[in-house]
Amino acid sequence: MYILARVDRSILLNTVLLFAFFSATVWVNNNYIYHLYDYMGSAKKTVDFGLYPYLMVLALICALLCGGAIRRPGDLLVTLLVVILVPHSLVLNGANQYSPDAQPWAGVPLAIAFGILIIGIVNKIRFHPLGALQRENQGRRMLVLLSVLNIVVLVFIFFKSAGYFSFDFAGQYARRALAREVFAAGSANGYLSSIGTQAFFPVLFAWGVYRRQWFYLVLGIVNALVLWGAFGQKYPFVVLFLIYGLMVYFRRFGQVRVSWVVCALLMLLLLGALEHEVFGYSFLNDYFLRRAFIVPSTLLGAVDQFVSQFGSNYYRDTLLGALLGQGRTEPLSFRLGTEIFNNPDMNANVNFFAIAYMQLGYVGVMAESMLVGGSVVLMNFLFSRYGAFMAIPVALLFTTKILEQSLLTVMLGSGVFLMLLFLALISFPLKMSLGKTL
């Protein structure tokens, strides 16, 4: 084990690109996107003399945390946190009607910066590889078992939702409302459907792409279709797209340059602006960039207001609160929708840093960030030491979940803990101690 801290030309290039990306985020928000969500509280970002020096320093810190390329699971997680979470939390902070005076050195922006810094530093720990690669036969047997369990759960979901199952685009929100009753959060149906699909299919699909095995490819697509028909979820299709591109690229080159990821997102921002200028409306802005950057930045402003009004929640909405005799209250995401947006049916999903801040302030953020950091170390260890390539899609699954859910929900309800356990089982040489004994 060793710690890598290296600065080269790629870091300088990424600093420039991240600065351009952050600056473009402010420009696009103020001129093209914020008005698409102003009915919920989004606003223009205040631009003053100190903004651009701040963005340059922020870009340098983010470039140092990301490094030059995505080579390991932890690199993927940190890079996605930087290019998705930083823009709406530390660049567009204050671009809302709930906390217009929010600064990066206070409140939820500071909590998020603190958490990303912890995870980014932990990710600098490196491990020397061993001669033996991942146990192929052991891994294949586990994948077959997962695929069988996944198919059983898909059949279960289909029959439970048969009364309203549909691929109709207009009825997606109605299906979501019905699914909340049929597959209620915290119920056996809810846990089974969530873990049996959303935890399994990214790994199965990734294996199919990487090994060119059509069965797992088709199974991943079937999962996305079932989740769309039963739950009205578009998220699985985005995950399939990301996994396919990532696995194909990794299969060919073995790494992804961070500069290319930043350039791709920068081009999306500019394409959205160009589409608006040419057609007077941008589908890209409305259906992708608004959801990726403007909606979460507005919700984080609401988080700051919530904490200032109600203080810390002390995990009263979790099983921990029930075990401590406090009683289990309404989930924070729904309480945020009720108290700040006056909509009791609104599930105001925010990232796990923000949830931890609402639960226990900076102490909660530090504790949960260390848990995520520990998971990063485990995935990096298995990947570097034992060649556990499946840690890459697990890291992608982990990241996409913590961007909009609490850590406890991600680990247990979304099955990430189970996938980490599965990853360890197919990676560690389980028969080593038995062989030595004999």
UniProtKB/Swiss-Prot annotation:
<keyword id="KW-0812">Transmembrane</keyword>
<feature type="topological domain" description="Periplasmic">
    <location>
        <begin position="91"/>
        <end position="106"/>
    </location>
</feature>
<feature type="transmembrane region" description="Helical">
    <location>
        <begin position="74"/>
        <end position="90"/>
    </location>
</feature>
<feature type="topological domain" description="Cytoplasmic">
    <location>
        <begin position="66"/>
        <end position="73"/>
    </location>
</feature>
<comment type="pathway">
    <text>Bacterial outer membrane biogenesis; LPS O-antigen biosynthesis.</text>
</comment>
<dbReference type="GO" id="GO:0009243">
    <property type="term" value="P:O antigen biosynthetic process"/>
</dbReference>
<dbReference type="GO" id="GO:0016757">
    <property type="term" value="F:glycosyltransferase activity"/>
</dbReference>
<feature type="topological domain" description="Cytoplasmic">
    <location>
        <begin position="1"/>
        <end position="14"/>
    </location>
</feature>
<keyword id="KW-1133">Transmembrane helix</keyword>
<comment type="function">
    <text>Polymerase involved in the biosynthesis of the B-band lipopolysaccharide (LPS). Catalyzes the polymerization of the O-antigen repeat units on the periplasmic face of the inner membrane, leading to the formation of the lipid-linked O-antigen molecule.</text>
</comment>
<dbReference type="GO" id="GO:0008755">
    <property type="term" value="F:O antigen polymerase activity"/>
</dbReference>
<feature type="transmembrane region" description="Helical">
    <location>
        <begin position="107"/>
        <end position="123"/>
    </location>
</feature>
<dbReference type="GO" id="GO:0009276">
    <property type="term" value="C:Gram-negative-bacterium-type cell wall"/>
</dbReference>
<feature type="transmembrane region" description="Helical">
    <location>
        <begin position="201"/>
        <end position="217"/>
    </location>
</feature>
<feature type="transmembrane region" description="Helical">
    <location>
        <begin position="46"/>
        <end position="65"/>
    </location>
</feature>
<keyword id="KW-0472">Membrane</keyword>
<feature type="transmembrane region" description="Helical">
    <location>
        <begin position="148"/>
        <end position="164"/>
    </location>
</feature>
<feature type="transmembrane region" description="Helical">
    <location>
        <begin position="342"/>
        <end position="358"/>
    </location>
</feature>
<feature type="topological domain" description="Periplasmic">
    <location>
        <begin position="359"/>
        <end position="360"/>
    </location>
</feature>
<feature type="topological domain" description="Cytoplasmic">
    <location>
        <begin position="378"/>
        <end position="398"/>
    </location>
</feature>
<feature type="topological domain" description="Cytoplasmic">
    <location>
        <begin position="256"/>
        <end position="257"/>
    </location>
</feature>
<feature type="topological domain" description="Periplasmic">
    <location>
        <begin position="275"/>
        <end position="316"/>
    </location>
</feature>
<feature type="topological domain" description="Cytoplasmic">
    <location>
        <begin position="124"/>
        <end position="147"/>
    </location>
</feature>
<dbReference type="GO" id="GO:0005886">
    <property type="term" value="C:plasma membrane"/>
</dbReference>
<keyword id="KW-1003">Cell membrane</keyword>
<keyword id="KW-0448">Lipopolysaccharide biosynthesis</keyword>
<feature type="topological domain" description="Periplasmic">
    <location>
        <begin position="419"/>
        <end position="420"/>
    </location>
</feature>
<feature type="transmembrane region" description="Helical">
    <location>
        <begin position="361"/>
        <end position="377"/>
    </location>
</feature>
<feature type="topological domain" description="Periplasmic">
    <location>
        <begin position="237"/>
        <end position="238"/>
    </location>
</feature>
<feature type="transmembrane region" description="Helical">
    <location>
        <begin position="220"/>
        <end position="236"/>
    </location>
</feature>
<feature type="transmembrane region" description="Helical">
    <location>
        <begin position="399"/>
        <end position="418"/>
    </location>
</feature>
<keyword id="KW-0997">Cell inner membrane</keyword>
<feature type="transmembrane region" description="Helical">
    <location>
        <begin position="258"/>
        <end position="274"/>
    </location>
</feature>
<feature type="topological domain" description="Periplasmic">
    <location>
        <begin position="32"/>
        <end position="45"/>
    </location>
</feature>
<protein>
    <recommendedName>
        <fullName>O-antigen polymerase</fullName>
        <ecNumber>2.4.99.27</ecNumber>
    </recommendedName>
</protein>
<dbReference type="GO" id="GO:0098567">
    <property type="term" value="C:periplasmic side of plasma membrane"/>
</dbReference>
<feature type="transmembrane region" description="Helical">
    <location>
        <begin position="239"/>
        <end position="255"/>
    </location>
</feature>
<dbReference type="GO" id="GO:0009103">
    <property type="term" value="P:lipopolysaccharide biosynthetic process"/>
</dbReference>
<feature type="transmembrane region" description="Helical">
    <location>
        <begin position="317"/>
        <end position="335"/>
    </location>
</feature>
<feature type="transmembrane region" description="Helical">
    <location>
        <begin position="15"/>
        <end position="31"/>
    </location>
</feature>
<dbReference type="GO" id="GO:0016020">
    <property type="term" value="C:membrane"/>
</dbReference>
<feature type="topological domain" description="Cytoplasmic">
    <location>
        <begin position="336"/>
        <end position="341"/>
    </location>
</feature>
